[in-house]
Amino acid sequence: MSVGSRSQGLLACALSKEKLTQLFKYCFVAFINMKVRPEDSLKIENIVASAKVTDYLDLPMLASKIEGAEYNKKRFPGVVLRMQDPKIAALVFGSGKVVLTGAKSVNSLSKGLNILGDKLRELGIDIPKKLEYKIQNIVTSADLATPINLNKIAVGFNLDKIEYEPEQFPGLVYRLDNPKVVVLLFGSGKLIITGGKEPDDAKKAVVKILSDLRSLGLIT
């Protein structure tokens, strides 16, 4: 290969690397500037559900037989079972009622309840093969990705649905009827949606909030 040909080859290679570097920088900047839709920022923080597994449970016996069970009836009237996979807690009461808390997904609830059912069956307790739960509350966080003026919201929204006392609490409380949830709005644009019964309730609430804010001209 001649010196000239080699030089041209090296130049072509250098240009190729330069173009790749420019392309990488362009893609990186585009990624950083890409805005996530508020509806896509939803994150389930906690799901609380209840279930009825039997008519009676001997709590002292459960506490002594199940490894890791916590029971102090002077502090709390139930046995606390903390699971690692899924990472949830089961509050078990003598009436046979169970409260599951700490779940991050509906699947975690089902898995956790089944694990509890298996533990109780191993102790000879008659537990139905199919256990069902009822969701009591879903707490979800979201991000509008833009600061919001809580004072203007307090004036513009339906006053019957608003609670805003910045000296006592930094967020604005907004009660929705459909879906029936409570939304905590913060000046940073962060939201906490609580009271949901279905996973989609949070998304519906965010869509409603966005619509209300746009109608007031507070966001574009």
Where are these regions (language model features)?
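Intrinsically disordered, low-complexity polar/charged tails and linkers
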Residues: 24-99, 103-182, 188-190, 196-220
